[in-house]
């Protein structure tokens, strides 16, 4: 998509400097979870896989270890630097791309799998829909999209309870500060799970599963239908 003067500036939330990125790296023990997710998704040698919002590159490197050709994409230079270190340490090849959901470069119908974890909430809802349409266009027909993000599963009458539970969960389990939770709620763009589901199906995906777990976390497995299939 060509840049326009009205186009959303993803780099207003490049997110993390090197100091904060190191905190994410230190607390992220996701190797086993990443491997399990990729196994569930059926990753095969020779697949083209994109990890958009790749963070420290754990999942991208695990996919490369399974024989996939991997594009590790992130808007944050600090995170891409961590991903490159991960790849060197594990002796795998990944391609890094400094871009986000609205700006990553792709050839239509080229990926066997796209993964995006905890990146979509950086975009307002209109731009979430644009991003999901781009992901749909980048996937081969019959291929999968695996999405995880911070979403609201309660109605608006329960925000205080849910946000406080989420804050406690992240502080106790991931070592984040309360300030980081406050920043997310005040300045970022998480939305309701049912809104995400509608956006995904409107973008053309078949929703295979939606799992709402832990405070304010949602996991979605999608498929891009083949021509002639019901969406």
What are these regions (language model features)?
Residues 56-103:
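Class I SAM-dependent methyltransferase SAM/SAH-binding core
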Residues 203-231:
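Core SAM-dependent methyltransferase catalytic element
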Residues 52:
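Conserved beta-strand/loop positions that form the S-adenosyl-L-methionine
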Residues 106-114:
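A short acidic, Gly/Pro-enriched loop at the edge of an enzyme's catalytic core
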Residues 129-141:
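A short glycine-rich, Lys/Arg-flanked "PGG" loop and its adjoining helix->strand segment in the class I
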């Amino acid at each position: 998509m060509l840049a326009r003067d009205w186009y959303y500036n993803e780099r207003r939330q490049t997110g993390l400097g090197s100091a904060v990125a190191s905190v994410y790296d230190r607390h992220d023990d996701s190797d086993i979870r990443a491997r399990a997710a990729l196994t569930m998704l059926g990753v095969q040698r020779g697949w083209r896989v994109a990890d958009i919002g790749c963070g420290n590159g754990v999942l991208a490197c695990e996919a490369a270890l399974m024989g996939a050709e991997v594009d590790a994409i992130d808007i944050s230079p600090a995170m891409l630097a961590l991903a490159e270190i991960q790849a060197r340490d594990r002796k795998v090849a990944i391609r890094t791309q400094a871009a986000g959901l609205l700006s990553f470069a792709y050839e239509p119908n080229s990926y066997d799998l796209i993964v995006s974890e905890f990146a979509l909430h950086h975009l307002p809802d209109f731009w979430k829909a644009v991003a999901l349409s781009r992901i749909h266009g980048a996937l081969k027909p019959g291929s999968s999209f695996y999405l995880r993000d911070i979403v609201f599963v309660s109605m608006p009458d329960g925000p205080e309870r849910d946000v406080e539970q989420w804050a406690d969960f992240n502080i106790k389990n991931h070592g984040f500060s309360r300030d980081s939770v406050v920043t997310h709620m005040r300045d970022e763009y998480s939305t309701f799970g049912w809104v995400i589901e509608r956006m995904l199906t409107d973008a053309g995906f078949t929703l295979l599963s939606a799992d709402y777990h832990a405070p304010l976390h949602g996991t979605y497995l999608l498929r891009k239908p083949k021509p002639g299939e019901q969406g």
